[in-house]
Amino acid sequence: MVMVCVALVVPARAQGPDVNKVLADIRAKDQGQLAISEEDGRFLRLMIASGQRKRVLEIGGASGYSAIWMAQALRATGGRMTTIEYEPARAKELADNIRKAGFSDIVQVVAGDAFAEIPKLQGTFDFVFLDAWKRDYKKFLDLVFPRLEKGGLFTAHNVVNKKGEMEDFLDAIQRNPALWTTIVSPAGEGISLSYKK
């Protein structure tokens, strides 16, 4: 009788970037309070994953905290994101944080004025996250809405705690017959969700 022993060798999984550490480092350095809350980040990740979103636009990337939350979901959906940041130094920090978190292959960082950069982008979007100058929210909606796919979500941050700075935007998303809109507030700042019918 011959006995054959077969050993299955499973290679050790390569350790990737510690995304939680990158997120914690960004929060620790966020002196200007520009980053969204962790609760809002988890909410955005869930919205992208559950909706199987694949083409995401972020307007106002800051240091990359929200982009990293969304990129986690995009890794699962096979999607990609473009994030735009106006301040050059902050855009560099954003790109560095995206690289440290291991998402450079799916997140494109654009430094510049979003009003000038968005028209240069190709294609449409199925998810938009807006967290830029509050007084410009309505202008961004007008610029991006034609490129939001049917069934897409247009989301905006700070719609509760800074609603006085964006009344025209809030009125527009509530009255537009092509949108179903609601507002949620996981951490008190508020996120509007507008679904394009």
Where are these regions (language model features)?
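Bacterial N-terminal signal peptides
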Residues: 1-9
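A short alpha-helical cap/connector motif
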Residues: 10-129, 134-197
